């Protein structure tokens, strides 16, 4: 398989973009090598808003056989094809100011970020978004406000249709992955990174042991040393009935489908992911009464593991991988999407299927050399 082309790029690092409340978010702008803002023709833009560090490794990206690629390298792939690429730290994360409250600031902050991009000399007024998991949530949150310039989206494994039913709770039952996520990310928070005592307190906790010491309460949890993370976690945990708190922007896209612009959207997830219901509900909701294409991909993977051909003890075979089966590679799939919808490139000769689903089963059932069952499967399309 040919490796994606990666070329040098120009960087406008650590642009501090002001939000409506005055908080500034750290933003990196990647431009094609030699590009002259204000002199050369403006460019279509690709945006990813992330809580995981705008210049850090993206664990699911793959280039030249390397799994886990720094975001600047991902940006260089797209800038080499004539796009501007923007990576931004979410509020309260890494270089951004403000207090992190999971999910609920992403709509207004995303809207304000697109408004800022639209004012820049390197932007031609057409913006696409991308991202996995939380970076899919940030996309859906901003789309619910119909922001200026939003022209297409690629959501991978996220973008809450209804956080009470899927993603934060499952049909009302609280997902304890929210607690493990909060603990892990609290250790990377500005509070912990700037205060060795806070970091030491977090690292001294045994998160597994804490799960044997239920119930937790404020001040008596592994997050007690970082109140902003403890507070939002308990707000989610206590909200055990579906009320107005679950209809908030950022965790309830199904209440905003009519507000989301009629633009091309690609939705991808996997049968063993936490966001199956979210992805299917968003597909159903966004295909009603719209002219723009909405495309669905459902693989047999775990969360973000689009080129891993097994899940647990089930082996699905080489056809299960995204790369080489649905497209040459995931970067190339997104490039073709953005060229089509941000640059009006001609569509391919073959019609783009509305849905591509991996149908599991049909294997021999025998164990392979790794001890997994040959479950098999094949891609089908509609």
Please describe what each predicted stretch is.
Residues 130, 134-205, 271, 290-335:
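A catalytic-pocket lid/entrance helix-loop region that shapes and gates access to the active site
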């Amino acid at each position: 398989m040919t490796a994606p082309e990666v070329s040098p790029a120009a960087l406008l690092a650590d642009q501090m973009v002001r939000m409506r409340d005055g908080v500034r978010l750290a933003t990196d702008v990647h431009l094609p090598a030699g590009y002259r803002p204000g002199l050369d023709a403006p460019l279509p833009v690709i945006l990813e808003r992330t809580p995981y560090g705008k210049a850090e490794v993206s664990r699911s990206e793959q280039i030249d056989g390397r799994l886990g690629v720094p975001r600047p390298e991902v940006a260089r792939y797209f800038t080499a094809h004539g796009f501007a690429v923007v990576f931004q730290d979410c509020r309260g994360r890494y270089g951004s100011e403000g207090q992190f409250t999971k999910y609920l600031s992403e709509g207004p902050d995303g809207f304000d970020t697109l408004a800022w991009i639209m004012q820049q000399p390197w932007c031609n007024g057409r913006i696409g978004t991308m991202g996995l998991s939380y970076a899919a949530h940030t996309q859906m949150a901003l789309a619910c406000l119909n922001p200026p310039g939003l022209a297409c989206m690629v959501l991978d494994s996220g973008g809450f249709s209804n956080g009470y039913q899927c993603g934060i709770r499952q049909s009302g039952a609280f997902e304890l992955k929210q607690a493990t996520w909060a603990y892990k990310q609290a250790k990377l928070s500005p509070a912990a990174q700037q205060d060795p005592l806070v970091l030491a307190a977090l690292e001294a906790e045994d998160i597994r042991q804490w799960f044997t010491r239920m119930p937790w309460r404020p001040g008596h949890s592994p997050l007690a040393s970082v109140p902003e993370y403890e507070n939002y976690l308990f707000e989610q945990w206590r909200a055990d009935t579906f009320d107005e708190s679950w209809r908030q922007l950022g965790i309830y896209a199904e209440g905003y489908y009519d507000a989301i612009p009629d633009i091309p959207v690609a939705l991808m997830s996997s049968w063993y992911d936490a966001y199956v219901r979210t992805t299917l509900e968003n597909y159903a909701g966004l295909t009603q009464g719209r002219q723009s294409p909405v495309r669905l991909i459902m693989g047999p993977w775990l969360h973000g593991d689009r080129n891993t051909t097994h899940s647990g003890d089930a082996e699905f075979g080489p056809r299960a991988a995204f790369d080489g089966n649905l497209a040459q590679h995931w970067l190339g799939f997104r490039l073709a999407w953005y060229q089509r919808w941000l640059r009006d490139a001609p569509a391919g000769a073959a019609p783009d299927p509305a849905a591509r689903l991996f149908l599991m089963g049909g294997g021999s059932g025998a164990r392979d050399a790794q001890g997994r069952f040959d479950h098999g499967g094949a891609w089908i399309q509609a």
